[in-house]
Amino acid sequence: MKHLRKCTALLLAVLMVFALAACGQKDDTAAVDKDLTVNVVSLNGTTGFGMAKLMADSKAGTAALNYSFTVETDPSNATAALVNGTADIAALPTNAAAALYNKTDGAVQVLALNTRGVLYVVTDGTESITSFADLRGKNVYVPVQNPTFIFQYLCEKNGLTVGTDITIDNTYAQPAELNTALASGEVHIAVLPEPMVTIARAANPDLTVALDLTAEWDKVAPAGSLVQGCVVVRKAFADAHPNEVKAFLDEYKASIEYLTAEPDQAGQMIEEAGIFAKAAVAAKAIPNCNVCFVSGADMQAPLTEFLTALSTVAPQSIGGKVPGDDFYCILK
C-alpha cells in the first residue's frame, strides 16, 4: 500500500508538470489578439523591401497577426496616416521619423532600423573619381532631401565647402529623374540610391560606381551610423498592444532575413507587393541595399549619431533637434 501511494504521488506530479506546460502554451497563444487589425504602411523602394515576405505571408494567411498593408510612394502619406491613426506601424526614412516625433511631441517611436546606407556616386567614365578629393571643382547632381543632406555632410567632413569647392545640383529632384538623365548622358556625376543604380547601369553599361557613400561615411563618422530607413509605431498603439508589437518585430525580422537569404524569391515578392516594379532588378539590387534589422538598445547609438550628423547640416530635416531616449521603443 505504501509503495502504491508513492507511485500515485509520482504519477500526479508528472501529470501536474504536463498540465502546467499546457497552460503555459495556451497563455502564450492567447497573448496575441488575432482579431486585432494591425495597420501597416510600407514604402516603395529599399525602405520597404524588408516588408515583402511578411506581406506575402499575410496574404497567404500564415502570419501571426491580422495585418492590413498599404504601400505608399510618398513618405508624407505614411506620416499623415500615423498622425490620424489609420496606420499603427510604418516604414519611414529615419530623418522623417525624427521630424514626426518632434512634431507630435513623441507620439511615434522607432521600433527597428531596416536600411543602412543606399547611396552611391555614379559616373559615366568621363571623370576619374576615386575619392572625395577628386570631386573638388565638380558639379554633382543629387536628389533632394536626405541624399543631399548626407552628401553635404560628407563633403564638409572631407574638406569640401559646398558652393565653393563643389556644387550640389538639385535640378533632378527625384532619383528616377536623375537616373534617366544619368543613363542618357545628360549628367556625368550623380548620387543615386539603389535600386536606381542598378537600373541606370543596365541602361548604360559605361556607368560605374565611383564611391560607396556608406563606406565613405564610416571613414569620417562612427562606423555603422549611416542608417537611412526604419519602422516606427504609434506610441499609443505600442502601449496598448505590446504583445502584438513584439509579434510584429519577430515576423519582420524573419522577413528581412529571408530577403537577404533568398533575393530572387524576395524580388518576386517585392514586385507582387507593389514595393518595386521589377522583380529581377530588385533581386539584383538587394546585396547593395544594406538592408538590416537592428532593434532594442542596439539601434539607439547609430541612429542618434546619424541624426546628430544631419543636425549639423540640415536641422530642419529632423524637426529641429535630435530626439531623446523616448524616441526608441525598447520592448521589455
Task: Please describe what each predicted stretch is.
Residues 35-57, 132-199, 264:
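Bilobed "Venus flytrap"/periplasmic-binding protein-like clamshell domains
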Residues 304-332:
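Conserved C-terminal helix/tail region of periplasmic/extracytoplasmic solute-binding proteins
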Residues 37, 43-77, 83, 100-103, ...:
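Short, polar/charged alpha-helical segment
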Residues 95-96, 165, 174-269:
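Pocket-lining segment of extracytoplasmic ligand-binding domains
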Residues 49-53, 73-107, 119-130, 176-181, ...:
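Pocket-flanking alpha-helical
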Residues 53-54, 119-129, 225-244, 295:
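A bilobed periplasmic-binding-protein/Venus flytrap-type ligand-binding module shared by bacterial periplasmic
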Residues 238-313:
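Secondary-structure end/capping motifs
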Residues 30-33, 124-139, 162, 239-243:
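Flexible hinge/capping segments at coil-to-helix
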